[in-house]
């Protein structure tokens, strides 16, 4: 995907990943931040916000009222293509983690890894 090609981004990592998402979002795009796994810091400039009108919107997953939360889950259940979701997830066993870690660190893994701690 080309730089400044994204209309919207959902980021659950924070830090440099969130800063890069803002930098790569097109004019009028929206970036949502819902996690800080990498860092709570935002090492970015205000350029995407000023020059392209990018919006950074926080997602409250802790204190959000139950009404909107239930509505969001209902919409996901209705609209999510489960076959597409399954293509984004690779299940590995806990015993596989050390072998997969170098690929994760090298950026060779796409999607999400689901670790089965019983394997």
Predicted regions and their residues:
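Conserved NAD(P)H cofactor-binding loop of Rossmann-fold oxidoreductase domains
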Residues: 13
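Glycine-rich phosphate-binding loop and adjacent beta-alpha segment
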Residues: 16-82, 117-119
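C-terminal hydrophobic helical "lid"/dimerization subdomain
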Residues: 70-119
